[in-house]
Amino acid sequence: DECFSPGTFCGIKPGLCCSARCLSFFCISLEF
């Protein structure tokens, strides 16, 4: 399955972010 890159909207399908966490409906990268 494809995953969303950081900064992508994920409100509809949370938990599908690539190496990121869905916060405030957007994928937020865990590494800064």
Curated annotation (Swiss-Prot):
One of the record's GO cellular component terms: host cell presynaptic membrane
Coiled-coil zones: none
GO MF: sodium channel inhibitor activity; toxin activity
Tissue expression from the record: Expressed by the venom duct.
Presence of keyword Secreted: yes
Modified residues (4-hydroxyproline): P6, P14
Domain of life per record: Eukaryota
InterPro entries: Conotoxin_d-typ_CS
Keywords annotated in UniProt: Disulfide bond, Hydroxylation, Ion channel impairing toxin, Knottin, Neurotoxin, Presynaptic neurotoxin, Secreted, Toxin, Voltage-gated sodium channel impairing toxin
Residues annotated as signal peptide: none
Disulphide linkage map: C3-C18, C10-C22, C17-C27
Location in or out of the cell: Secreted
Other information: Negative results: does not show activity on rNav1.3/SCN3A, Nav1.7/SCN9A, rNav1.8/SCN10A, Kv1.1/KCNA1, Kv1.3/KCNA3, Kv1.4/KCNA4, Kv1.5/KCNA5, hKv11.1/KCNH2/ERG1, shaker and DmNav1/para.
Known function: Delta-conotoxins bind to site 6 of voltage-gated sodium channels (Nav) and inhibit the inactivation process. This toxin acts on Nav1.2/SCN2A, Nav1.4/SCN4A, Nav1.5/SCN5A (weak activity), Nav1.6/SCN8A (EC(50)=2.5 uM).
Domains (record comment): The presence of a 'disulfide through disulfide knot' structurally defines this protein as a knottin. The cysteine framework is VI/VII (C-C-CC-C-C).
Family per record: Belongs to the conotoxin O1 superfamily.
Protein name: Delta-conotoxin-like CnVIC
Organism: Conus consors
